[in-house]
Amino acid sequence: MKSAAVVNYAPEKGSVEIREIDKPEIGEEDVLLEVVNVGVCGSDLHQWTADHSWHVNYPVVLGHEFGGHIVALGSRVTGWKEGDRVVSETAAVIDPNSPMTKSGLYNLDPSRKGFGYGVNGAMTKYVRVPARCLHRVPDQLAFEQACLTEPCCVAFNAVVENSRLKPGDRVIVLGPGTIGILCAAMARLCGAEVAIVGLEADKHRLDIAK
């Protein structure tokens, strides 16, 4: 069975096209996810315009901010069932013996490969996902919002974990992109006074940020 996919097939600018790809085969610790929604990250655009700084395993299906329904499970997968609504983390391949992985910082594992550049991502119908990457999505939460889980985590890490804001702090966010707006939202949840600064071209985004 084949499905349409958004494929980044070469390092040259504009090397993205729709291709037919085979349905992925899963390993014993993987699930097969039927994709419902997938976000377009700035890194997807950078690969399209060929101004990225990371190694890409061409050809590769783009997309790493995604969610969907489990449609098949590997033989060693527990705690999940077909039909479960989930989102995925981005670290598709990690070394379990890496010091970073062992300390819980698997996102900093030097051998890490992410969806959309290291392995096939989710801009297609089906994607193979390690079960360790999954997080459950409540029934009342739409996938359009659930697919913002990864950028929300970026904002949480920046604002809550690293900046350690306190109620009453005053914060300026430079740039009303997705991450900037989410950082502003996190800062407000921490009790800070927040201002977002942008350019004239950002007027629509600043309106959204309000």
Which residue ranges define each predicted feature?
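Short structural boundary motif marking the start of a folded domain
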Residues: 1-6
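Glycine/charged-rich beta-loop-alpha catalytic/anionic-binding loops adjacent to active sites
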Residues: 133-143
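Cysteine-cluster motifs in flexible loop/terminal segments that predominantly coordinate metals
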Residues: 41, 80, 90-135
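Cytochrome P450 core scaffold surrounding the K-helix E-X-X-R motif
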Residues: 43-49
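Cofactor-binding loop segments of dinucleotide-utilizing enzymes, especially the Rossmann-like FAD-
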Residues: 10, 36, 73, 176, ...
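Glycine-rich beta-strand-centered segment in the early N-terminal region that forms part
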Residues: 24-38, 51-97, 138-140
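Mid-domain Rossmann-like dinucleotide-binding core that forms the NAD(H)/NADP(H) cofactor-binding site
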Residues: 141-210
